[in-house]
C-alpha cells in the first residue's frame, strides 16, 4: 500500500484540517460599494467632525506609551461609565457588573452562542435579518433553524403566535429576533 499523496498546495493542506461542518461555507462579506449611503456596512454617511477627530487624536497621543500592552479586557472604565449613564438616563440603578461590553456586535453575538448554543444545540432566527446570526451559529457548531415569516400584514410579518409556535417546534437554545 502506498502512502497517501501529500498536497503541495498550502490551501489544500489547510482545507483538509478544516472541520467537516465548515467545508463549503463561504466567509461573510459586505461589498464595499462607492455609493453615498452604505446601509450594508452600518457606516455613517457623514464625515467625522473635526473636533471629534482632534479629541480622538489627543486621546491616542496620550495613550501611545501604553500601546505595547493589551487594553483592559474587562472594559472596566467603559462599563463603569455606561452603568452610570444608564442609571442617570433611566432612574434604575445599574452596576458595572450588569453591563456587557465587547469588540463589536459580532463578538457579543459569538459569546451568546458559545455560552448558550454550540455543538448539539439549536439556534433559531427569522430571515431576512442580520446575516451573521446563522454564520456565527453554524461556525460555533449549532444547528441553524431558519424561521418562517409571513402573515396577514405581508411577507415579512412576524407575529407573537408565529414566534411561539416556531420556538415550541424547534426547541432552540438561542432565538434571534
What do these predicted regions represent?
Residues 65-177:
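Conserved core of the PLP fold type I
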Residues 4-104, 111:
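N-terminal small-domain helix-loop-helix segment of the aminotransferase-like
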Amino acid at each position: 500500500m502506498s502512502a497517501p499523496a501529500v498536497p503541495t498546495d498550502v490551501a489544500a493542506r489547510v482545507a483538509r484540517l478544516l472541520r467537516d461542518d465548515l467545508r463549503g461555507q463561504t466567509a461573510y462579506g459586505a461589498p464595499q460599494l462607492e455609493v453615498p449611503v452604505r446601509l450594508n456596512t452600518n457606516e455613517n454617511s457623514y464625515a467625522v467632525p473635526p473636533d471629534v477627530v482632534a479629541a480622538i487624536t489627543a486621546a491616542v497621543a496620550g495613550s501611545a506609551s501604553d500601546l505595547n500592552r493589551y487594553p483592559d479586557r474587562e472594559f472596566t472604565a467603559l462599563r463603569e461609565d455606561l452603568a452610570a449613564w444608564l442609571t442617570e438616563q433611566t432612574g434604575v440603578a445599574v452596576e458595572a457588573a450588569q453591563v456587557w461590553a465587547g469588540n463589536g456586535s459580532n463578538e457579543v453575538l459569538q459569546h451568546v452562542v458559545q455560552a448558550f448554543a454550540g455543538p448539539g444545540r439549536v439556534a433559531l432566527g427569522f430571515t431576512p435579518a442580520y446575516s451573521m446570526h446563522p454564520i456565527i451559529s453554524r461556525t460555533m457548531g449549532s444547528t441553524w433553524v431558519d424561521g418562517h415569516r409571513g402573515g396577514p400584514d405581508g411577507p415579512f410579518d412576524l407575529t407573537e403566535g408565529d414566534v411561539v409556535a416556531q420556538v415550541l417546534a424547534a426547541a432552540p437554545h438561542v432565538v434571534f429576533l
